[in-house]
Amino acid sequence: MNKKEQMEFLSQYEDFWGHLSDEEKEFVCHNTEFVTYHPGQNVHSADLRCVGVLFVRKGCLRVYIMSEEGKEVTLYRVNPGEVCILSASCVLSEITFDVYVDSEDLTEVVVFNAFAFAKMISKNIYVENFSNKMKAIRFSDVMWTMQQILFFSFDKRLAIFLYEELIKNGPIIRYSHMEIAKYLGSAREVVSRMLKYFEKEGIVLVSRKEIEIVDKKKLMERL
């Protein structure tokens, strides 16, 4: 993707791009790069350099937190057309916790340098508003995840995960039990046990490499 194509891609973010002067647009383009991440590749973590704001063109990013023991809890995903702003947490004074970002699929992003983004925030009120809006959206996602973990039973959390995958990708879900456990902040054995129960209830069919949702109505009754 050349610079002209990057500008055309960024123009879809009207709240951001639509309020920039020609000089500011040139500054943005000078401080962006097109990057492709492979499935499972770490994009951002506390140990890596501050990546910047990620505008997702293709694929999917997973944003998560991790305990000292290595237990992961997925906070949210960033899909095509969406923005990952917590990957620029080093220049966002309101963000005081470490997050990790991995690529789930072959993912294409336009990366806006974190420090250039901070400079834009200080000079353009619309960019500051865009930043605040993105943070509010992601904070809402984080609170939804915390609500599920704290107040929902595991069978309901698993049902929500399966239903969201059904809506997004259809009835065939190609995630391992370990991957689902990471998304839900649980153990693989717990996921396997609950999927086996769902299978006995006629909700899913579980095979070695995939899970098939066979009764959407029964699944929705678990939500």
For every predicted segment, state its role:
Residues 1-34, 38, 83, 88-92:
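Cyclic nucleotide-binding regulatory module and flanking cytosolic helices
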Residues 33, 42, 60-65, 83, ...:
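Short beta-strand segments in beta-sandwich/barrel cores
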Residues 43-48:
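Short phosphate-coordinating micro-motif centered on Lys-Gly-acidic
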Residues 51-64, 79-81:
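Glycine- and acidic-residue-biased ligand/ion/polar-headgroup-sensing regions
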Residues 74-132:
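Cyclic-nucleotide recognition modules
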Residues 144-161:
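Short alpha-helical segments that sit at the start of domains
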Residues 154, 162-223:
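Phosphate-/nucleic-acid-contacting segments
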